[in-house]
Amino acid sequence: MVKKTIRVMVEGGKATPGPPLGPTLSPYKVNIPQVVKAINDATKDFEGLSVPVEITIDIDTKEFEVRVGIPTTTALLMKEAGAKQPTGDPAHQKIGNISFEQVVKVAILKRDSLTAKTLRAAVKTVLGTARSIGITVDGKDPKEVQKLVDEGVYDEILSRYEEEWSKGGQ
């Protein structure tokens, strides 16, 4: 039982049998439309975002398995803010504003790829990313929000999401 794993980036919910997917899959003689449908079904919640996808193909049986990764923190924050691209000058040019709860939700989604051990630490990491791309949080500079997190201002919101964090964002 020989397996081959292929990693590609696709736009959520919009994979097509054309390049790069079709030509990459055709040597393995899998049912490409089935693979595309499986990818689109699995990535539909990330529409408009570039999503890492891993396709594992059993060379003998032509069966396949699709695993979807999580988009980058930057991509998730930009989607939350409704922005198209990060700013080149985050100190002076803001591209959007999101709520603290949106930051928490991004932190939970990114749980497995962040080195943070606690929800509080993960939120502070995501706030750092928000600051670097020009997104404000509740109308404030994310650095200021990080200080408020340290001071306990957001403890009530964090405690509401603590259980979801401990389950791994499932």
UniProtKB/Swiss-Prot annotation:
GO terms for biological process: translation. GO terms for cellular component: large ribosomal subunit. GO terms for molecular function: large ribosomal subunit rRNA binding; structural constituent of ribosome. It comes from the Archaea. Transmembrane segments: none annotated. The keyword RNA-binding applies. PROSITE patterns: RIBOSOMAL_L11. Keywords: Ribonucleoprotein, Ribosomal protein, RNA-binding, rRNA-binding. Part of the ribosomal stalk of the 50S ribosomal subunit. Interacts with L10 and the large rRNA to form the base of the stalk. L10 forms an elongated spine to which L12 dimers bind in a sequential fashion forming a multimeric L10(L12)X complex. Belongs to the universal ribosomal protein uL11 family. HAMAP family: Ribosomal_uL11 (MF_00736). NCBIfam families: PRK01143.1. This is Large ribosomal subunit protein uL11. It comes from Desulfurococcus amylolyticus (strain DSM 18924 / JCM 16383 / VKM B-2413 / 1221n) (Desulfurococcus kamchatkensis). The gene is rpl11.
